[in-house]
UniProtKB/Swiss-Prot annotation:
Residues 2-75, 81-156 form the RRM domain. Its main location: nucleus. Belongs to the RRM IMP/VICKZ family. The modification Phosphothreonine is found at residues 573, 583. This is Insulin-like growth factor 2 mRNA-binding protein 1. Residues 155-195, 561-598 are annotated as: Disordered.
Amino acid sequence: MNKLYIGNLNEKVTAEDLVKTFEDYKIPYSGQFLMKTGYASVDCPDDQWAMKAIETFSGKVELHGKRIEVEHSVPKKQRTRKLQIRNIPPHLQWEVLDGLLAQYGTVENCEQVNTDSETAVVNVTYGTREQARQAIQKLNGYQFDNNALRVSYIPDENSEVDSQRGPDNGRRPGYGPRGTSRQMSPGSGIPSKHQHADIPLRLLVPTQYVGAIIGKEGATIRNITKQTQSKIDVHRKENAGAAEKPISIHSTPEGCSAACRMILEIMNQEAKDTKTADEVPLKVLAHNNFVGRLIGKEGRNLKKVEQDTDTKITISPLQDLTLYNPERTITVKGSIEACCLAEQEIMKKVREAYDNDIAAMNQQTHLIPGLNLGAIGLFPPSSAMPPPALGNSVPGPPYGPMGASEQETVHVYIPAQAVGALIGKKGQHIKQLSRFAGASIKIAPAEAPDSKMRMVIVTGPPEAQFKAQGRIYGKLKEENFFGPKEEVKLETHIKVAAAAAGRVIGKGGKTVNELQNLTAAEVVVPREQTPDEHDQVIVKIIGHFYASQLAQRKIRDILTQVKQQQKGGGMGTPQGPHPQGMTELGSPQGLAQEPRRK
């Protein structure tokens, strides 16, 4: 995306005028300016310079009395579903942006773009061309917190190929939207053994030491990359004027740790030589989605890392998170050796959390065609994402044998004091959430005046459930209804036919125990339940978001199998007792553990 379209040009503008403008602002270009009536085009050296040119010139620079418009040059055949939205207020919450984008159609993907500007930029993929066309018409110039959004097409290199292929878009299972393998085994949807290489080690280093890390003409950093077999990106242009700069290290876990050690040694030596600090702490950046599991229940995981490595570890507060900054800063203080050991333990936990989320996500994408966590802000956009379901840009196959449109009702229990935050001012937040998720969301009346928990009733198809519940979990964390070292775990209830409850439990509790071990959620069928007027009983699920979602989907899968068998002439002998004779399940041993792999 390094070719630029320069529009709204006065007829008096010449190629020399554009050359001078680019040179005045020190924006490099390659080749010549191709002049047409009212517009021109030119190539930039790379995507980053093209983005810099757009941010510098578009709507800001005048030539012969007219403000020029600069955007990516996109051939008509590639103006399909992909848009770039610029000038987004940096402190805007994801859910607000999601709600706005979702008004114009299904958002398949939404990724933030790293830029030098103070405002945020995202690339968005809509479900259809028409949805993208409507979004560009409605959102271009849209005023958001005194910022006028700028929206333009970006090239969809796959569009011409897709139009020549069948309804499956010519994509092979296990391949991403552009046909490139994303570290997946083709057709499997399962992460390959090299998946860890997709989790970069992100460090935050004082700006004053960046020069020493890079070295004269890049000699030092080339030496680090060569010795550690890694790729290192020093983001010098991010957050101009900031006291610290991020560094991304891409390699094996061992390669990342070796590069980290060398960088830490260089910084400490530079601090000693310049007498600027006695020691330089190690700062690791980790996406907020993983931090809760790094901390552990009551902070146990973090305390163990501190004790085992003889370090002091602190984590930045949740209040620092914004659309522009989804990462938390983990600060490690101690000797160089101790800090390096702590880095290994920290990243081990982060990678485990990532792998478990990938596993949960693969379950979701298998059961809910077209589901994309990146599109709803629940998964780090920088991570390698599992491939979309086959034929992601066309209507997906039905959800299981029962069809995709089947409505589900889930009761989610939240702290009573969180109700106001979930509803929002004049009901604005809950309305946005409902629109975004495509689900009905209602707050049930309190069971008693002093009730500590309130029931949220979520009704909608599987993907809507996933989006809505994910946002509810996220809102509670954002609003600090759970402590900084506490993972959000909620209780959800789903109703199942009394005749099918035994199948959920399994013979001797085997099914429910396997379910708990697989999902790390607590699954409880309370004893001595009396079926309601619809002959249904409640199944309780307690756990963090991914655990709860996977448990819900597995239970729904069991219920679908029961319905199939009933249609085929009876479900046979139940594998468990009648619900009135059930025994209450205790807390599973695996509740605080990672799901077992089979």
